[in-house]
Amino acid sequence: GDVAIAAIAIDPNGNGDIASNISLKDAYLAHQNGTALFLDARSPDEYEAGHIFGAVNLPTHAFMDSLPYLENLSPNRLIITYCDGADCNASIDLAANLKLMDFPKVAYFFGGWQEWIDAGYPIAGNTHE
């Protein structure tokens, strides 16, 4: 079934509930049952060093370049954005951009890469081959 999205993100610009925040547990469940698309908002270098298994690299600064890819995505799919964790806002920015494109199911995983590897969840990339 659908993964419950708990909290509502507070947009620092005061735009209210633009995207949801998803917990590590819920992000992992969505990963395991294959319902979510994970988007890595970090740089290509960071992505290649290591990323959540199956995630697609979509750096926030290259968002416009990614529009052809995004326009082909199913709007029914849950999209989960992430970056490095607590010190990184790129996942929130990316989630906000996706919401502006009218993707209805967008969540940002604020714990990000750091929380995911700390939990020992599936990863890919050069770091651990």
Show where each model-derived region lies.
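Short acidic-hydrophobic, aromatic-tinged amphipathic segments that line or gate anion-handling sites
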Residues: L58-P59
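Active-site neighborhoods of enzymes that stabilize oxyanions during catalysis
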Residues: G120-E129
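Solvent-exposed loop/turn segments at secondary-structure junctions
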Residues: S43-E46, A62-F63, G85-N89, G112-W116, ...
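Short amphipathic alpha-helix with an adjacent loop that forms part of the alpha/beta core around
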Residues: A30, D65-N76
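Catalytic cysteine-centered active loop of the rhodanese-like fold, especially the PTP/DSP P-loop
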Residues: E71-W116
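Flexible, polar/low-complexity N-terminal or interdomain linker segments that lie immediately upstream
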Residues: G1-L37, D45-A49, E129
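Second-shell loop/turn segments in exported
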Residues: D11-I18, F53, Y82-A86, F103
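Short active-site oxyanion
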Residues: Q32-F38, F53-G54, L78, P104-K105
